């Protein structure tokens, strides 16, 4: 008698994991070029540097001319390897935290936001080593063929700096802030607004209703969390002076960037980030919901 609920729980968890992994894989394959551009903007420090990008269009032009088409896909292997477990963790833990918070008398709005925060913090711990490798590869301006392999670069980091907070897990506090804040806003906004706007009986209009809310969710979350993202890129990317660590901790890095470069420097890469995580956030939620719905009906 007790076997059925257990199988049901395992199957439910499996659906959430498969749907979340599928959402992540689709999103990264579509949107990675914008992530490369965003990272390049965030790690450049001086507008007078001849290698700096003047605008979004200029960055696309220079990367294509100097590094070729594959330059836009630098560092894609770490997120591909990480996206399935990362997004699976994102959506699965969100659902689990939401269930746990159901035992506490919280408003639905607060429940969605806190569950999102919890899922973001959990996701950050899983993904941070992959992010360290990805940012390092994206910062490399050599041609795709000349840059080190993903595994080779990860080995370099481990050999020189180890596994800890100065090595493969550097920037963990900034990653926790980035993912925690993003997911809190992303899930909190999406599910609260979705519940306010009536469901449309026309499947095409219903698709666009969800896409529009997802787009807004990803955009707003990106604007709010980007200072953490800039700090993360500075900590995990190449330091200004080789052999000297300038950027160590999240809030100290934010303060340094603000003091030396001004408030706008904390929003570097905002446009490519919005272009990626606005539609990308909508794609993830839609792929998750439609895949999960299909799995419910067929498995």
Curated annotation (Swiss-Prot):
Q: Where are the Solcar repeats?
A: 11-100, 107-196, 205-294
Which chemical reaction does it catalyze?
Answer: 2-oxoadipate(in) + 2-oxoglutarate(out) = 2-oxoadipate(out) + 2-oxoglutarate(in); hexanedioate(in) + 2-oxoglutarate(out) = hexanedioate(out) + 2-oxoglutarate(in); L-2-aminoadipate(in) + 2-oxoglutarate(out) = L-2-aminoadipate(out) + 2-oxoglutarate(in); glutarate(in) + 2-oxoglutarate(out) = glutarate(out) + 2-oxoglutarate(in)
What start-end ranges are recorded for coiled-coil regions in this protein? Answer: none
Note the superkingdom of the native organism.
Eukaryota
- Asked whether the keyword DNA-binding is assigned, the reply is no
Which terms under GO biological process does the entry name? lipid transport; lysine catabolic process; mitochondrial alpha-ketoglutarate transmembrane transport
> Looking at the Swiss-Prot or TrEMBL record, what is one Pfam family this protein matches?
Mito_carr
Q: Which GO terms describe its molecular function?
A: alpha-ketoglutarate transmembrane transporter activity; antiporter activity
Q: Which UniProt keywords apply?
A: Antiport, Disease variant, Lipid transport, Membrane, Mitochondrion, Mitochondrion inner membrane, Primary mitochondrial disease, Repeat, Transmembrane, Transmembrane helix, Transport
The places in or outside the cell where this protein is found are:
Mitochondrion inner membrane
Q: Which spans are transmembrane here?
A: 17-37, 70-89, 113-133, 167-187, 205-225, 277-297
Report where it is expressed, by tissue: Expressed in placenta, gall bladder and colon.
The Gene Ontology CC terms held by the record are: mitochondrial inner membrane; mitochondrion
| Major subcellular site | mitochondrion
Topology term for the membrane: Multi-pass membrane protein
The Swiss-Prot or TrEMBL record describes its family as follows: Belongs to the mitochondrial carrier (TC 2.A.29) family.
What does the function comment of this entry state?
A: Transports dicarboxylates across the inner membranes of mitochondria by a counter-exchange mechanism. Can transport 2-oxoadipate (2-oxohexanedioate), 2-oxoglutarate, adipate (hexanedioate), glutarate, and to a lesser extent, pimelate (heptanedioate), 2-oxopimelate (2-oxoheptanedioate), 2-aminoadipate (2-aminohexanedioate), oxaloacetate, and citrate.
Question: Which medical condition is this protein associated with?
Answer: Mitochondrial DNA depletion syndrome 18: An autosomal recessive mitochondrial disorder characterized by early-onset progressive weakness and atrophy of the distal limb muscles, loss of ambulation, and atrophy of the intrinsic hand muscles with clawed hands. Additional features include scoliosis, hypo- or hyperreflexia, and decreased pulmonary vital capacity. Examination of skeletal muscle shows mitochondrial respiratory chain deficiencies involving complexes I and IV, associated with mtDNA depletion.
Name used for this protein in its record: Mitochondrial 2-oxodicarboxylate carrier
Species assigned in the record: Homo sapiens
> Lineage of the source organism?
Eukaryota, Metazoa, Chordata, Craniata, Vertebrata
Query: What would be the name of the gene that encodes this protein?
Result: SLC25A21
């Amino acid at each position: 008698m007790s076997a059925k609920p257990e199988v049901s729980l395992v199957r439910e968890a499996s659906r959430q994991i498969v749907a979340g992994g599928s959402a992540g894989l689709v999103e990264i394959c579509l949107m990675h070029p914008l992530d490369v551009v965003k990272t390049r903007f965030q790690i450049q420090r001086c507008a007078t540097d001849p290698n700096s990008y003047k605008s979004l269009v200029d960055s696309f032009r220079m990367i294509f001319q100097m590094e070729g088409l594959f330059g836009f896909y630098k560092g894609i292997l770490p997120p591909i390897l990480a996206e399935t477990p990362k997004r699976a963790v994102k959506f699965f833990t969100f659902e689990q935290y939401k269930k746990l918070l159901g035992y506490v008398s919280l408003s639905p709005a607060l429940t969605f936001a806190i569950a999102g925060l919890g899922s973001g913090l959990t996701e950050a711990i899983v993904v941070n080593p992959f992010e360290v490798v990805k940012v390092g590869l994206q910062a490399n301006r050599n041609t795709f063929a000349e840059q080190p392999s993903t595994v080779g670069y990860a080995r370099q980091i481990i050999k020189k700096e180890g596994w800890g907070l100065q090595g493969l897990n550097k920037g963990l506090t900034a990653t926790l802030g980035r993912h925690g804040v993003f997911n809190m806003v992303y899930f909190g906004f999406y599910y609260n607004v979705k519940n306010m706007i009536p469901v449309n009986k026309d499947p095409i209009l219903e698709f666009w209703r969800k896409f529009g809310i997802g787009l807004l969710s990803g955009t707003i979350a990106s604007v709010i969390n980007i200072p953490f993202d800039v700090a993360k890129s500075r900590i995990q990317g190449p330091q200004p002076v080789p052999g000297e660590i300038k950027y160590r901790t999240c809030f100290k890095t934010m303060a340094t960037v603000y003091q030396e470069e001004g408030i706008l420097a904390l929003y570097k890469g905002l446009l490519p980030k919005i272009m990626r995580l606005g539609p990308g956030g909508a794609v993830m939620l839609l792929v998750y919901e439609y895949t999960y719905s299909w799995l419910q009906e067929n498995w």
